[in-house]
Amino acid sequence: MNKGSVGLMAMIFACSVALTAQDTVRYSGQVRSNVDYHHGQLVAAVGAHNIQTMRALRTGSDVPSWTYNHAPMMAYWKGRYWVSYLSNPVGEHVPPGRTLLQSSVDGYVWSSPVVAFPPYRIPDGHVKTGRSDTARNAYAVMHQRIGFHTSASGRLFVLGFYGIVLGAKDDPNDGNGIGRVIREVKPDGGMGEIYFLRYNKGFGAHNTSYPFYHHSKDKDFITACESFLSDPLQMMQTVEEADRDDPLIPLRRDYKAFSHYRLDDGRVVGLWKHALTSMSADGGKTWQYLPLRAPGFVNANAKIWGQRTSDGKFATVYNPAEFRWPLALSVSTNGLVYTNLLLVNGEITSMRYGGAYKSYGPQYVRGIQPGDGVPADGNMWVTYSMNKEDIWVSRIPVPIHDRVDAHVDDRFASSNASILFNQWNIFSPLWCRVGIDRIGDSTALVLRDADPFDHAKADRIFPSSGRVRMELSLTADQTDHGSLEIELTDVHGMPTLRLILDSTGKILTKQGYRNKSVGSYVKGRSINIDLTLDAASRFYTLSIDGGKSSNNLCFQPVAEVSRLVLRTGTVRRFPDADTPTDQDYDLPGAENKYKEVRYLIHSLRTSVPK
């Protein structure tokens, strides 16, 4: 989260130029993200589910009331997903700071956050090395690149770091903080006593509030702490906050946000911000070359995550731009050569609360590091913040696919509704949930929306087609508020047609600048849409509830269509590449829900027209 320097960027550039035949991670694909679109015009990873775990609120006394929430970490332990994240009241590096913890059995329904590490008082009179500011009634700011450690005996620990910020342009990760703390997580979500794991210079048992881990009577806990401290791959993730001459850290350089995975031959691949990379043949003790920018990768001052997936391949997840959108992934068969670039999350929620250094977009991605659990479903799970404000996770099905071979025949009243749901791509905020619900004696894919600043979204990918028939059956639970937009898009997310269930009971279609009425709908009564599109002619025929077909012109030409989009709101185009960063204002009404809307999707069928 340190803003970096011109010197570092110059070093990265020089190293990149020098990199020629080095055996290293590289991106060989030709696809690039287009920053003018939140989704980057990227092909979607089929079945990616994006789920909000925490929505920040300014009012109230509960833990989500702090509106800077960032840098989440993830683990899987005892059949639960665990996420920790750091939090400040308003902005980045503005004290006080704390770390919070959430958990979930299924990755979709999450516990309320609880404080793992509370605000910590800096000793009065403390003067930070290199600065003249003196601490008076001051509190620490938390900053950590590693959030969990699972011991050899199977115990889970949450970690954090108390850094010091005493004035403008000060940073908590400059090596002049207080120290790293550790705490056991219990299977029921409770936590043990807080201990210091490692002090920074000038701090020790004489001037800190928590005991040093050596003082614990739990020998297995002490063993777990010492195992962490002796593991170079764990310690590499502490370099930013640690003493600059800490002998336990193998590579004491200003590289940020380390992640790693092992190749089939046992070598460790390291990844850092700016898509820097290096290799280690001895488990991280030494590195074969100073980190260099991975050829072909595009990544700025945001994290890049890499891991082995359950099918034996490898994946990196990152923002492939100089901005923090979209969130995308690349896949490799050998862990070195990455060949594609697929969309994970192409939405940007409205930033409801201003604050220092708050960047737009889904960012600071982190997965489950080796040793911290393997999800039972075999899928890839990552966590990240949205706008440094809300906390999200994504479930990415493994094997990772960018297309489907068979046309869709999804009937959600059937017994395999959950299997069908896994083939949809969803964007599911806490106040706009997307999921399979039981409605009466049947089940449906349900989109809800009670958030004035967000929307629910569900996409279904089908085989790329120049001509396609789509049969969609759904029910709206209201006609006097809310709206649902239905689009057919090409593989890059570009819509060619849009139907709208508006807030007055009308069904509209977008015709250039204007919307044209094509029918009406009734609360609680199913709507059956039968649509046949010819992309070459740009016309589509539309029949509603078996009525007479109407001929309609697409509002944007595309060569093919391969995605149905259902969205409880309009397309978002803010922010863009020219939007100033560091938003310093709040959006009015961000605390309030509006009257919920609900849309029930009963079935979807696509086919080649006769």
State where each predicted segment sits.
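Extracellular/lumenal carbohydrate-interaction signature centered on repeated Trp-anchored short motifs
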Residues: P64, D459-M470, V518-R525, K595-L600
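Short tryptophan-centered beta-strand motifs in secreted/extracellular beta-sheet-rich domains
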Residues: M470-L472, G524-D534, Y540-L542
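Short, aromatic/His-centered strand-loop micro-motif at the edge of beta-sheets
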Residues: I507-D530
